[in-house]
A protein has these predicted regions:
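Glycine-rich loop/linker segments at domain edges
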Residues: 90, 165, 171-177, 305-348, ...
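Short beta-strand elements
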Residues: 46, 174, 180, 347-352, ...
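C-terminal catalytic domains of large/alpha subunits in multi-subunit enzymes
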Residues: 226-227, 378-383, 413-418, 447, ...
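Signature of N-terminal electron-transfer/Fe-S-associated modules in redox systems
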Residues: 1-156, 590
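Conserved beta-strand/loop scaffold segments within soluble protein domains that form the structured core
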Residues: 281-284, 369, 388-390, 395-483, ...
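Extended active-site and interfacial segments that coordinate phosphate-rich ligands
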Residues: 174, 275-288, 364, 371, ...
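Helix-loop-helix junctions that connect adjacent transmembrane helices in secondary transporters/permeases
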Residues: 296-377, 540-606, 690, 740-750, ...
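Flexible, low-hydrophobicity surface segments
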Residues: 145-307, 328, 413
Length: 896
């Protein structure tokens, strides 16, 4: 027993436990987040006697008489200032790390009210953020400091919601103050706790599961095996090959496989019960690499074989073009597994309802979760109700189910509400990673530096299950040729199953790996030709009206050249410089139906936005709010963005592929057009394009809403009385039509409805440390410039880790990483990142916007590697890069 003060109140802890658990589970102070419980991430920071301390470290019996402050205990003035400052500068994305950042900021400002930028960065060095790149968090701390020095007075802010303006995010305040709810913040009456007993071996036959001892433990609600599943055992995002649990007699595929599920009244009883479950195995030799998987004598990971898929894309005659070229280069490249390391571990709460089961989730696709769970439960998908809570980061790692179906199954079988949450070590083990890839690329150029032909072979380790391995490989291949204009290329890719952890979606979606190979080879080619790396890219850059290597004609909105021109002076004025270009699709494309859907409803005198699209920190709710505000000339206070769900919000697909701003943004715009028409405005919605014909209200006929580079905003004098439409709903839908990969009957296929383009430059100091990254990104129309900058800064910081420091070591298919050993960049190590937004009109959908969530990570690695090539002349062809000041001792390499 220990007594101490929490937010000024004397409290007594009856049992000894970590302070984090006491604050959350007993006092319900949920601003204190559980990101790792390993003392590594900083999301649980509190003040103990004025010092920022990770609450997962001290036990309560060591805190007698101490004073603890959480965000809930800040003064009203402090709360208002921090909430305003973090929102004002765009420092909030997923938000999971932010309360901990606020505590570290307060610890600094209480002793140093006027810190420097370096001092602010040092103060949050023990707080990890995977979304922002830290720049805007430091901006927020400095703005808060200035505001406190001026008496805490906050200036009056505009309530406008307009496209093109840096409107603060609609969910910023609740995330800063910790009042918003992530699934782990939910505590229901009668709630039990569930978890999986996982495989002891990456590959083994399960001979028997003995659960009697666990069931005999008081407080255990149930132990469930594959035999208890009412529907199908196997689920999967695209391919149903992922076992909900491994049945007795079957073979495990990786260490993260669930053998059985245990449910108990408390987390403590749950952990004891899991240890009492006895599983008999027959260990088998695992498949540890794609090279081994491809051998005819290798064990079969799945009955279908070890080859998940093969992709082949070509145009022209690459072999002949390379033979005829004046210069030919061939290089081999390797990239490793990397971990998403989002701050919020996977968590779901589920309960039975009168119509089926409800899941309160943190994932990237509510409808996908409902569909897969319904297959497992043997229920119609309409009886599985999924609502997305706040999502503490995803980056692709929350596309596949991890805990949602397990929670639903326990709730369905037990009849009790249940919370299933992965520990950080489980999260690192279970969810899919970035694909390791091996790329061999051959490039031919003429004497003028024009690319004549490119060939590439790509090999990927997709791990234990398919996940998104097929589409990732496809995207890696279709983008391997780069954003350049030439007619001859041939790319072959193969993805193999192994008994390693699965690989799936990760920001960049396969393009990050092949772009590294293509761009580094192009940098070397420029060196061989005696021209600058900027010049060779400018000569080859795709321009409007030209054909991309895949045959798609570049539309007028194509903006690669403009991104190159934006960094020309930077390149010319710095010697230790590397540069890389990239393109990335927005939307699924390649012939797959890709639909955005949105409802704008008038309810209670407000405009309600409803869409099944998940907001995972990228700011979709803010984007849709600005589109509605622009179209209907209303302010933020008039608009309510509802949480994504599959009950009363239409299916708008998974949040991936940089698609939601484009497809759901366009659907939202169309819904607004229908509302305008119903209100009596002179608006006609074309069934073919969905573009509003409001010529008399536009400077440019057929252009969309928004000001500046893309069009003109609806005049403020044009008003409609939308409140008279109370009770009505307006449905918008946009179908992005594209041609299938390898379509033979289409001369110029449309692989994707839109592409983003980028050029990034890395400048080194003479000692090899990075001085700055300059990132020029074509965004079409920046619906929210702050959001765009935040995506760029966060994407670059994440990519710097991928390039220089991050690794996910495996030994015989067994990972050994902890959160603190992943090599994530921290605030005091991230270099200056300068965002350059390139706007250009011509793209019709979604007010001219193109999503940039993924492309921000893609060109960083080759830009950095190119800078080191400029520094010492050495080609670095594997990641993370070796022989840099950032290299970590004894960093293991992926074993091919």
């Amino acid at each position: 027993m220990a007594s101490f003060y929490v937010n000024g109140q004397l409290v007594t802890a009856e049992k000894n436990q970590k302070l984090l658990r006491f604050l959350r589970d007993e006092l319900r102070l949920t601003s204190v987040k559980d990101g790792c419980s390993e003392g590594a991430c900083g999301t649980c920071h509190v003040l103990i006697d004025g010092k920022a301390t990770k609450a997962c470290v001290p036990s309560v019996d060591k805190l007698e008489g101490r004073h603890i402050i959480t965000v809930e205990g800040l003064s009203d003035t402090e709360k208002e200032v921090y909430a305003w400052a973090f929102a004002k500068v765009g420092a909030v994305q997923c938000g999971f790390c932010i309360p901990g950042m606020v505590i570290s900021a307060k610890a600094l400002l209480d002793v140093n009210p006027d810190p420097s930028r370096e001092e602010a960065a040092f103060a949050i060095r023990n707080n990890i953020c995977r979304c922002t790149g830290y720049k805007k968090i430091i901006d927020a701390i400095l703005l808060a400091a200035e505001t406190f020095r001026n008496g805490g007075r906050i200036p009056q802010e505009s309530d406008r919601a307009r496209v093109g303006e840096a409107m603060p995010r609609i969910d910023a305040k609740e995330k800063v103050l910790g009042t918003g709810k992530y699934p782990d913040d939910i505590y229901l009456d009668g709630m039990i706790y569930g978890s999986a007993v996982r495989s002891r071996y990456p590959r083994a036959r399960v001979l028997a599961i003995h659960k009697e001892k666990a069931l005999a433990l008081p407080g255990v609600v149930g132990v469930y095996t594959a035999d208890d599943i009412p529907g199908k055992v196997k689920v999967g995002h695209l391919m149903q090959d992922w076992d909900t649990m491994i049945p007795v007699g079957k073979i495990t595929h990786y260490l993260g496989d669930a053998i059985c599920l245990v449910a108990a009244e408390t987390p403590e009883i749950l952990e004891k019960a899991k240890k009492l479950v006895e599983v008999e195995y027959e260990p088998l030799k695992p498949v540890f690499s794609p090279t081994y998987a491809a051998q005819p004598f290798a064990p079969q990971v799945h009955e279908s074989g070890n080859l998940l898929c093969e992709k082949h894309v070509s145009r022209g005659n690459a072999d002949q073009a390379i033979r005829d070229a004046d210069y030919v280069l061939m290089y081999h490249y390797e990239t490793p597994y990397t971990e998403h390391a989002f701050l919020e571990p996977e968590c779901a709460v589920a309960y039975r309802d009168e119509d089926g089961v409800t899941i309160l989730s943190t994932d990237q696709g509510t409808y996908d979760t409902a569909r897969e769970t319904s297959i497992m439960l043997g229920l119609p998908k309409e009886k599985v109700h999924v609502t997305n809570m706040l999502v503490g980061g995803g980056f692709g790692g929350k596309e596949d189910m991890t805990v949602q179906h397990h929670a639903a199954l326990i709730a369905y079988l037990s009849g009790r509400p249940v919370k299933v949450k992965l520990t950080r070590s489980e999260s690192i083990l279970v969810h899919p990673k970035r694909h390791p890839m091996k790329v061999t690329i051959t490039m031919g150029c003429n004497n003028d530096g024009l690319i004549q032909g490119v060939k590439a072979e790509v090999t990927a380790d997709t791990g234990a299950y398919a996940s998104l391995g097929g589409p990732v490989l496809e995207r890696a291949c279709t983008h391997a040729a780069g954003p350049y204009h030439y007619d001859n290329f041939e790319i072959t890719g193969r993805a193999y199953y192994t008994n390693n952890p699965p690989a799936g979606a990760f920001r960049g979606f396969g393009v990050t790996q092949t772009c590294y190979a293509m761009e580094m080879t192009l940098t070397k080619m420029a060196h061989e030709l005696g021209i600058s790396p900027w010049e060779i890219r400018y000569r080859n850059a795709i321009r409007p009206g030209q054909t991309l290597p895949n045959g798609q004609i570049a539309p007028p909105s194509t903006g690669l050249v403009e991104t190159l021109e934006a960094v020309k002076d930077i390149c010319e004025n710095n010697k230790n410089m590397g540069i890389a270009c990239a393109m990335k699709n927005a939307g699924v494309g390649v012939g797959i139906p890709d639909t955005g859907r949105c409802i704008v409803a008038v309810h209670g005198g407000k405009l309600h936005i409803r869409s099944g699209a998940s907001c995972i920190g990228q700011g979709l709710g803010t984007v849709l709010t600005q589109i509605v505000g622009t179209m209907l000339h209303c302010d933020r206070e008039d608009i309510v963005y509802e949480a994504a769900n599959n009950v009363d919000a239409p299916d708008s697909g998974t949040t991936s592929g940089s698609r939601q701003t484009l497809v759901t943004g366009e659907a939202c715009r169309r819904a607004c057009q229908k509302l305008l028409e119903a209100a009596g405005a002179d608006v006609k919605v074309s069934d073919y394009t969905g573009i509003a014909n409001i010529a008399e209200l536009r400077d440019l006929p057929g252009e969309n809403c928004g000001d500046g580079a893309v069009g003109t905003e609806l005049p403020e004098t044009v008003q409609v009385d939308w409140k008279k439409l109370e009770g009505q709903e307006f449905y918008g839908e946009y179908l992005a039509k594209t041609d299938p990969l390898g379509a033979q009957d289409v001369a110029n296929p449309v692989s994707h409805v839109a592409y983003g383009y980028a050029t990034q430059v890395c400048i080194l100091n003479d000692d090899g440390t990075i001085k700055e990254i300059d990132a020029a990104h074509f965004v079409g129309k920046a619906i929210n410039p702050l959001n765009c900058e935040g995506q760029i800064e966060g994407g670059v910081a994440m990519a710097l880790g991928f390039t220089l420091t991050e690794h996910y070591p495996l030994y015989d298919c067994i990972p050994s990483a902890k959160y603190g050993t992943l090599g994530l960049f921290r605030a005091d190590k991230v270099p200056t990142i300068n965002s350059i937004l390139v706007e250009k009109k011509g793209q019709d959908m979604a007010c001219g916007a193109i999503g940039i969530g993924e492309i921000t990570t893609i060109p960083t690695a080759p830009a950095v590697a190119g800078a080191y090539f400029a520094l010492d002349g050495e080609m670095r062809c594997s990641l993370p890069l070796m022989k840099t000041p950032y290299e970590r001792p004894k960093m293991p390499r992926y074993w091919w």
